Amino acid sequence: MRKLSLQEATRLAEQTAGVAEGHIPYGSGLGAPASFTLAWLLQEAGVEEIRVASGSSGMGDHFWVETDQWRIDPTLRQFAHLNSRPLVEPVSEPGGFPADKYHAIPRSRQEAVREVSYGFRNAAETEQFVREMEAAIRLQ
């Protein structure tokens, strides 16, 4: 079973944030697309005990990834009032948004593309986002 160190989880969160930030001007937040794609890529790399969580941020639904150790929240930066919070925190520490629901992780690239497609205007934008995530997210 593969585990992520804090450094590796932070690096992956930063890389995911970088990709998502390039797409945020399209409208709604990219917490769900970023979280589902990151979780799928982590699972493909052999990281176990991953789940996508969602809860209310006070401004609508908010999505993040949880491993057995870390809460990885790569799209916090899209909210100016949350910029000071770290993108990765231990799941044992209070302070994150409470999870209202846990979601299944896409089992294939096709499922990942389908799952995140609602966050984009068309299939080409969806495909571009997933390709950028695949290129950015590399586990060492």
Task: Label the predicted regions.
Residues 1-140:
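A structural boundary/capping signal
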